[in-house]
Each structure stands twice: as C-alpha cells, then as structure tokens.
Amino acid sequence: MGGISIWQLLIIALIVVLLFGTKKLRSLGGDLGGAVKGFKNAMSSEEDKKALEDTEAAKTAQTTQQATEKKPESNKEQA
C-alpha cells in the first residue's frame, strides 16, 4: 500500500518514451552523462591541486626547518 510497483514504473517509463522519443532521451542522457563526467573531473582536479599544494607546503616547511637547524652550527664554527 502506497508503494510503487515494478509495473507502475514500467508504465511510467513507456509513457516518457512515447512523449519524448528515443532520440531526445538519448541526447538528454548523453548531456547528463557529460555533466556528471565534467563534475567528477572538476572534483578530482581540485583534490589534485590541494594535494599538490599540501606537498609543496610540506617541502617548504622541511627546507625551512633544515635551514634553521644548520644556522646554529655555522655560528659555533665562527666563534
């Protein structure tokens, strides 16, 4: 009671195909697929960009830390 059965879904699908036609539905599906693919590419490129920034920041921090550790040693040598 209140649920949609498989037969009701099939009837709705048949009506949609009759109203819009298969070519229109195919192009609509292609457009939707392209939009989803573009969204996924944008999300993955954003994640890649963030990961690249994180690794660059870590390298910079490590280089800075190594440079500050070497400075006291060179001061001792001069004294």
From Swiss-Prot:
Gene Ontology annotations for the cellular component aspect, listed alphabetically: TAT protein transport complex
Gene3D superfamilies: 1.20.5.3310
Alphabetized GO MF terms: protein transmembrane transporter activity
Coiled coil: none
Topology term for the membrane: Single-pass membrane protein
Biased composition, class Basic and acidic residues, residue ranges: 46-57, 68-79
Keyword tags: Cell inner membrane, Cell membrane, Membrane, Protein transport, Translocation, Transmembrane, Transmembrane helix, Transport
Transmembrane segments: 1-21
UniProt-listed GO biological process terms: protein transport by the Tat complex
Assembly information from the UniProt record: The Tat system comprises two distinct complexes: a TatABC complex, containing multiple copies of TatA, TatB and TatC subunits, and a separate TatA complex, containing only TatA subunits. Substrates initially bind to the TatABC complex, which probably triggers association of the separate TatA complex to form the active translocon.
PANTHER family tied to this protein: SEC-INDEPENDENT PROTEIN TRANSLOCASE PROTEIN TATA
Chain's role: Part of the twin-arginine translocation (Tat) system that transports large folded proteins containing a characteristic twin-arginine motif in their signal peptide across membranes. TatA could form the protein-conducting channel of the Tat system.
Similarity comment: family membership: Belongs to the TatA/E family.
Name by which UniProt lists this protein: Sec-independent protein translocase protein TatA
Native source species: Shewanella sp. (strain W3-18-1)
Encoding gene, per UniProt annotation: tatA
